[in-house]
Amino acid sequence: MSCYDLCRPSAPTPLANSCNEPCVRQCQDSRVVIQPSPVVVTLPGPILSSFPQNTAVGSSTSAAVGSILSEEGVPISSGGFGISGLGSRFSSRRCLPY
């Protein structure tokens, strides 16, 4: 018997076709699945740390003090703290027109 059926009297059907008794019926439970809304969780990114170290490599001879050293550690100029040797160091890497 469906939940929506009319209440039927237990006695013979009266001529007025009325229902004199209260009709209370409990229907089956309804099940509703409520999905949770999407949740955005932000996880912190990794922490990258480095420990840079400055290292000076050169000659321990007194002639190299105050001089600009080449990649091999040989003094380029002996002019003390001047920058006269700086141009010759970088000019060797330039492409010159022929």
Swiss-Prot record:
The keyword Lyase does not apply. Disulfide bonds: none annotated. Keywords: Acetylation, Keratin. The keyword Acetylation applies. It holds the Pfam family Keratin. GO terms for cellular component: intermediate filament. GO terms for molecular function: structural constituent of cytoskeleton. InterPro entries: Keratin. The modification N-acetylserine is found at residue 2. Belongs to the avian keratin family. The avian keratins (F-ker, S-ker, C-ker and B-ker) are a complex mixture of very similar polypeptides. This is Feather keratin 4. It comes from Gallus gallus.
